[in-house]
């Protein structure tokens, strides 16, 4: 990919995610590491990580049309309790996904497929913005930090979780590779 240069902090993660067919490019030559990750993209990655199991049944979300590239992934994730919609009938597939939403989804994925790896929890006091983690995501963030799925980003001599921030494709590739190392 033209946008993924050797030596970039995300280079190895993007290479591994692409090589293992967990993430795809935005085109044949562009990965777009700085582009925001959407809810549909993340669910597709996890569906691939699970081996792209076949699905059947009724889609609960009216904004996920049959035939879209993410349809099977959303149906699979919904049926397995890995994702919830923005409402009972809306998934918002093109909505950017935040870092705390990502760790919540990875935590649910782990509870479903590797429940033995859900017991640890870390304190978040080492992160300057730990108070900004939403209450609903607090246990998931503690889990992600304990298992080093998320390490935080350094700035001004402090570490930040940036839980409300939209995740980039490079960040998700990195989180994915750290998750696979569990």
Regions found by a protein language model. Name each.
Residues 147-149:
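Short, charged, amphipathic alpha-helices and their helix-cap/turn boundaries
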Residues 12-14:
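Thiotemplate assembly-line natural product biosynthesis machinery
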Residues 103:
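IQ-motif-like calmodulin-binding regions
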Residues 1-9, 24-43, 47-73, 80-100, ...:
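Feature responds to low-complexity, polar/acidic, surface-exposed segments characteristic
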